């Protein structure tokens, strides 16, 4: 039934498959930026949190009887840590974007979304396409023009990522400034790749720009990157959270977040709060190695290298695997051009990162097929 489509994917070098990689490979492919996924003492802490409760399963939707004390504790701790009035757990970042876009786009609202916003957000806009306007990536001038052309009486949501997942760029401060100029404008910030990687205390985009006033901000923070767990949380003013709780289909009609993931997120969050400065210093050392060796400066927990073609990308990916390094090989249509995505996970040593950087440098001397992203 799908043979021709699969053949076309093979021919274009776009075919994907699930693969069990050699655990001895150095992991520079995952989003485990702070290296928490290998800390077994934190896993034991998570189990200990669960042991004190009769049930270890969420059982139902949060609006039936699936809401658990661990859920409430995580919401409260995140709201306090990140300086928001209220918080709402969701099953994943994908479900979080679906909840925000499907629910907040009421009849008199428009959404202005960065063209490079995460695929889950772009997918969610298809529900209400007539209420969505895309602007050029990180282009404040293009956004201002589109806002100027929009009806003045509409509620306006502007959706950006703190750190963009496929180019490591940090969204400009101007996106926050513009919502202060427009009375009925609000900012949605997907902090999936910025929490745990930027900011004085690694708290993300809002801390990076020292933004204190959050009454016009809605933050989506995921647990599957720096916090090495699963799930996500929407943080916003209380009224917004109450509205989402009552209207968001991906909150109402889905089982509450796994209690094991919730406990694991709490355990990892507690460790992060205590160790954040040490983690920041360690991440900075990895970033400095990449800059000194390859001349690539990244503010985030990863960097990218752009390739001319899928075969060239896959050749580099294979070469690095042979040298003991696993990196991400990201191909169209996920990105416009093939990218090698290199994550600076702290579970790797500084010596590992030096070796990887030198391996990439040596590869670049014999190949002219990539440039820094």
From Swiss-Prot:
EC number: 2.3.1.47
Record-level GO BP terms: biotin biosynthetic process
Pathway: Cofactor biosynthesis; biotin biosynthesis
Reaction(s) catalysed (UniProt annotation): 6-carboxyhexanoyl-[ACP] + L-alanine + H(+) = (8S)-8-amino-7-oxononanoate + holo-[ACP] + CO2
Chain positions recorded as pyridoxal 5'-phosphate binding sites: 93-94, 165, 190-193, 222-225
Pfam families for the chain: Aminotran_1_2
Binding site for substrate: 16, 118, 334
UniProt keyword terms in alphabetical order: Acyltransferase, Biotin biosynthesis, Pyridoxal phosphate, Transferase
Cofactor: pyridoxal 5'-phosphate
InterPro entries: Aminotrans_II_pyridoxalP_BS, Aminotransferase_I/II_large, AON_synthase_class-II, PyrdxlP-dep_Trfase, PyrdxlP-dep_Trfase_major, PyrdxlP-dep_Trfase_small
Modified residues (N6-(pyridoxal phosphate)lysine): 225
GO molecular function per UniProt: 8-amino-7-oxononanoate synthase activity; pyridoxal phosphate binding
Family (UniProt): Belongs to the class-II pyridoxal-phosphate-dependent aminotransferase family. BioF subfamily.
Function description: Catalyzes the decarboxylative condensation of pimeloyl-[acyl-carrier protein] and L-alanine to produce 8-amino-7-oxononanoate (AON), [acyl-carrier protein], and carbon dioxide.
Assembly mode: Homodimer.
Name of this protein: 8-amino-7-oxononanoate synthase
Species, as recorded: Helicobacter pylori (strain ATCC 700392 / 26695) (Campylobacter pylori)
């Amino acid at each position: 039934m799908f043979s021709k489509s699969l053949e076309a994917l093979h021919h274009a070098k776009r075919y994907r498959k699930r693969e069990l990689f050699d655990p001895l490979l150095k992991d520079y492919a995952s989003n485990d930026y702070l290296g928490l996924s290998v800390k077994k003492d934190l896993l034991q802490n998570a189990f200990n949190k669960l042991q004190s409760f009769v049930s270890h399963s969420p059982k139902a939707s949060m609006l039936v009887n699936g809401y658990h004390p661990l859920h409430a504790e995580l919401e409260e701790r995140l709201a306090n840590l990140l300086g928001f009035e209220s918080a709402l757990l969701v099953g994943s970042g994908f479900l979080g974007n679906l909840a925000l876009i499907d629910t907040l786009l009421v009849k008199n609202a428009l959404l202005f979304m960065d063209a490079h916003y995460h695929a889950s957000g772009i997918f969610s806009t298809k529900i209400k396409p007539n209420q969505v306007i895309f602007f050029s990536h990180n282009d404040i001038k293009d956004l201002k023009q589109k806002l100027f052309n929009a009806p003045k009486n509409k509620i306006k949501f502007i959706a950006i990522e703190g750190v963009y997942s496929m180019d490591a760029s940090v969204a400009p401060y101007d996106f926050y400034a513009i919502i202060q100029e427009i009375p009925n404008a609000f900012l949605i910030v997907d902090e999936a790749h910025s929490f745990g990687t930027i900011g004085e205390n690694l708290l993300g985009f809002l801390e990076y720009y020292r933004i204190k006033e959050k009454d016009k901000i809605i933050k989506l923070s995921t647990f599957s990157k720096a916090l090495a767990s699963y799930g996500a949380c929407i943080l916003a003013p209380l009224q917004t959270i109450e509205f989402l709780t009552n209207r968001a289909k991906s909150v109402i009609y889905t089982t509450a977040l796994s209690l094991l993931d919730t406990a694991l997120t709490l355990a990892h969050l507690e460790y992060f709060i205590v160790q954040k400065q040490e983690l920041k210093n360690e991440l900075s050392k990895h970033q400095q190695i990449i800059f000194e060796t390859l001349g690539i400066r990244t503010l985030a927990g990863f960097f990218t290298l752009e390739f001319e073609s899928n075969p060239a990308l896959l050749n580099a990916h294979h070469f690095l695997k042979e040298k003991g390094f696993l990196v991400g090989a990201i191909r169209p249509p996920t990105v416009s051009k093939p990218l090698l995505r290199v994550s600076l996970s702290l579970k790797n040593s500084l010596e590992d990162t030096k070796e990887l950087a030198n391996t990439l440098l040596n590869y670049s001397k014999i190949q002219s097929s990539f440039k820094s992203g």
